[in-house]
């Protein structure tokens, strides 16, 4: 029985569409092996074989964040398992996303990157991908805001765009409940650094709560073990500290 594989490049985006990450779906994790050797090893896993042989359509959301290396390996993996030299082994592939948004995080152990985006790969060209550009905007109705966002998306910085952004910079907000505005940072490390600094400035007594959460999971030869420090078992809090 054939089916449609619904995937995305991150856990959060996969959850929103009721799918799984493309890395989990394909069995491709973080590896320092030679690409072809690694693919050959993954292609022998029974559940991966069954998954790709019955796959009719593969959907990959947030395609801009998929590395060229992973894109090429998925392409080749499908060919090997299905014994079909057509692009992706004859599987219909639907890619969605915006290459003007977040790009891929390239593997640090690969010192030289010939390509940054998957559309630069020979496999992309060989797949003869048809581009469909959606133009209707559903999330915004403010015409000026939409025009500003579209210019920023294309890297255009003119006087109109600058004026709109500057008008919102450091704008005073009503602070009725004494809550500080949320700050966004590119890394968890930087966010933790700022959170700890604010936490230390609060003079109230600290209270620590410890939690032990047990989760049952089905593991299959993971090449990307969960980082030991991904989550802490202790939560520290003080009166007046924001959570």
What annotation goes with each model-predicted range?
Residues 1-243:
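Conserved ATP-binding/catalytic motifs of P-loop helicase motor domains
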């Amino acid at each position: 029985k054939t089916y449609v594989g619904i995937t995305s490049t991150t856990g959060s985006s996969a959850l929103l569409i009721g799918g799984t990450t493309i890395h989990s779906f394909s069995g491709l994790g973080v590896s320092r092996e030679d690409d072809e050797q690694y693919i050959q090893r993954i292609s022998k896993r029974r559940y991966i074989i069954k998954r790709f042989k019955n796959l009719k359509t593969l959907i990959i959301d947030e395609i801009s964040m998929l590395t060229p290396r992973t894109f090429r390996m998925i392409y080749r993996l499908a060919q090997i398992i299905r014994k079909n030299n057509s692009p992706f082994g004859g599987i219909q592939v639907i890619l969605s996303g915006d290459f003007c948004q977040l790009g891929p995080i390239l593997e640090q152990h690969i010192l030289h990157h010939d390509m940054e985006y998957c559309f630069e790969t020979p496999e992309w060209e060989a797949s003869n991908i048809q581009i469909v550009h959606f133009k209707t905007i559903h999330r915004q109705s403010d015409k000026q805001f939409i025009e500003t966002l579209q210019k920023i998306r294309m890297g255009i910085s003119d006087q109109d765009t600058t004026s709109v952004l500057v008008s919102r910079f450091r704008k005073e907000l009503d602070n009725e409940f004494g809550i500080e505005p949320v700050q966004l940072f590119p890394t968890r490390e930087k966010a933790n650094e700022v959170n700890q600094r604010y936490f230390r400035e609060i003079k109230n007594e600290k209270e620590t709560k410890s939690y032990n959460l047990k989760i049952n999971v089905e593991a299959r030869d993971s090449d990307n073990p969960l980082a030991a420090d991904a989550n802490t078992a202790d939560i520290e809090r003080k009166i007046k500290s924001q959570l």
